């Protein structure tokens, strides 16, 4: 079945919200890149961090502005204190999709991100979180806080992508300083969010729009993000294998019932290259996988292919005996997370967005850092 993509009449339906220090740094990085078609907001308990941010839309969580002291409970209470302000920001923007990015394990990101997500969910906004877990050299207490925060956050988002910081170091060919390690983590948060938002806001030969992304990510639970790059004769195989291997995440494509595939390539790429790459990826997913794909040409790419994949719709084991604490006791209980169980199909079902006159996308060269990590694996 083929769906035709609606014309993009409002490119600013996406808001990226950075919560806490790491989330704010990722959003600052995206802002400085001049990304179009996306609104940005930073939320923090630290007034100094907000003052340093170039982002125009800022929300101080709580009344003191002195930070959360690495205590998620302080971050949670500060966010609850600012519920109305955050809600008003969402309502005024007309946002249909919110990305929440944060580093889990500290005070503000861990405690406040679930509150912000709950506000977005209650407003009927498609809510996706992209968060990091601490490095191994950080305290065990911080990892425990991160795990608890992730479980709480998962209750209030449609899709959750978790990036373990430790995975970032596995592909490096030299030791990194602590400053370099955290800068790399911030860049990966930015890359994860931007790779998804680009699918909607960038123009391509076969476009993907908000409805396409919503089909894959709404009510999906844990999701998987992978980016692969290939060049030369075996570019399709190289790019697809990089996506399948995906060293950056703890999840994988295996068992996914929903796939969103976006391919950026040079104009001389053969249709068979696209077919081969797509088949390699879908073969690793569930037998009844539903997939949507888009393509874009980039004129300065020479015999190259870049593939971005979002995989979702995994079978997850749930434990109803442990209920996470409500992030906002003053608020009504959040609706139960929808089951990510698409109806089985006899074979993979492909949904395409409509062609858009061969318009070329904006330059995605800022993703090359992650390609270098992937290529080293």
How would you describe each model-predicted region?
Residues 1-377:
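Tubulin/FtsZ superfamily GTPase core signature
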């Amino acid at each position: 079945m083929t769906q035709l993509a609606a014309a993009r009449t409002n490119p600013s339906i996406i808001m990226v919200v950075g919560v806490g220090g790491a989330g704010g740094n990722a959003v600052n990085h995206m802002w400085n890149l001049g990304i179009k078609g996306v609104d940005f907001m930073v939320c923090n308990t630290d007034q100094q961090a907000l003052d340093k941010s170039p982002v125009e839309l800022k929300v101080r969580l709580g009344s003191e502005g002195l930070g959360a002291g690495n205590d998620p409970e302080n971050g949670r209470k500060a966010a609850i204190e600012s519920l109305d302000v955050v809600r008003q920001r969402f309502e005024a923007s007309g946002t249909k999709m919110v990305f929440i990015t944060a580093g889990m394990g500290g005070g503000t990101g861990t405690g406040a991100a679930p509150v912000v997500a709950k506000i977005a969910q209650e407003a009927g906004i498609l809510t996706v979180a992209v968060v990091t877990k601490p490095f191994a050299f950080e305290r065990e207490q911080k990892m425990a806080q991160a795990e608890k925060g992730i479980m709480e956050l998962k209750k209030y988002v449609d899709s959750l992508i978790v990036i373990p910081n430790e995975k970032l170091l596995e592909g490096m060919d030299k030791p990194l300083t602590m400053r370099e390690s955290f800068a790399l983590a911030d860049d990966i948060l930015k890359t994860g969010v931007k790779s998804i938002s680009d699918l909607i806001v960038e123009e391509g030969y076969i476009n993907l729009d908000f409805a396409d992304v919503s089909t894959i990510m709404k009510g999906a639970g844990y999701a998987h993000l992978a980016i692969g790059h290939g060049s030369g004769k075996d570019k399709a195989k190289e790019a697809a294998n990089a996506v399948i291997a995906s060293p950056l995440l703890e999840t994988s494509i295996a068992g996914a019932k929903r796939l969103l595939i976006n391919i950026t390539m040079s104009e001389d790429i053969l249709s068979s290259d696209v077919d081969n790459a797509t088949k390699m990826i879908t073969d690793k997913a569930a037998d009844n996988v539903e997939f949507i794909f888009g393509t874009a040409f980039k004129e300065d790419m020479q015999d190259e292919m870049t593939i971005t994949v979002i995989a979702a719709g995994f079978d997850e084991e749930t434990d109803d005996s442990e209920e996470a604490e409500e992030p906002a006791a003053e608020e009504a209980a959040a609706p139960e997370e929808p089951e990510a169980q698409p109806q089985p199909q006899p074979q993979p079902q492909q949904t395409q967005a409509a062609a858009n006159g061969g318009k070329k996308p904006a330059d995605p060269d800022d993703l090359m850092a992650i390609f270098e990590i992937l290529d080293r694996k």
